[in-house]
Design a protein with these regions (language model features):
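Cytosolic, long alpha-helical scaffolding segments
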Residues: 1-182
């Protein structure tokens, strides 16, 4: 969730906030380390309360969210973006809320509690993100915009969409874990 919040701050304060890309990269490295630690512990643990494969799938899915988020921050700099489009800021807010829902759902899975309130909201947010990206890409092609700007922003919008889609994948995995263990 921290990486998503930092991306939201980065887009809200751009270009002055470009330095936040470094903090997002640190979050990405921390996520990778955590995923490696999960794998290490799974290899050392004989019995787990949840299927080992499900734990690994969930850890990987959560790491993907951070990876995609960091990718967006990196490409903002690589593409020399001068100012963010409002639709990118809206997508970042969707990403923040979806990661917040996942953050609230994950602890509930330990006791196999009902997480549907959170996963349904993640699915709703993913649909909202889809609507935002379609409208954003459509607005790029309404004329009068430099073709290089169109190419850059189309790619950035799609990368943001990948991060949001990854939250839905994580929610699906959480739902599967609860169903398996109910």
């Amino acid at each position: 969730m921290r990486a998503a919040e930092l991306l939201g701050e980065m887009l809200a304060g751009f270009p002055e906030s470009q330095g936040l890309a470094r903090e997002i990269l640190i979050c990405e490295h921390d996520g990778d380390q955590l995923t490696h630690e999960v794998v290490k512990r799974l290899n050392q643990t004989f019995v787990t309360p949840i299927d080992r494969e499900d734990i690994l799938l969930l850890a990987s899915a959560l790491d993907d969210i951070v990876d995609f988020t960091e990718e967006v921050a990196d490409y903002l700099g690589l593409y020399c973006v001068e100012a963010p489009m409002t639709q990118a800021q809206a997508q970042a807010q969707v990403l923040i809320e979806a990661t917040r829902q996942l953050q609230e759902a994950v602890p509930l899975v330990r006791d196999f509690k009902d997480i549907s309130e959170h996963t349904v909201e993640v699915h709703r947010l993913e649909n909202e993100g889809d609507r935002i990206v379609r409208a954003a890409i459509g607005s790029l092609f309404q004329g009068g915009i430099d073709p290089m700007v169109v190419i850059r922003w189309k790619d950035l919008f799609e990368r943001l969409e990948h991060a949001i889609d990854a939250t839905e994948r994580a929610a699906d995995i959480l739902e599967g874990i609860v169903i398996k263990n109910a």
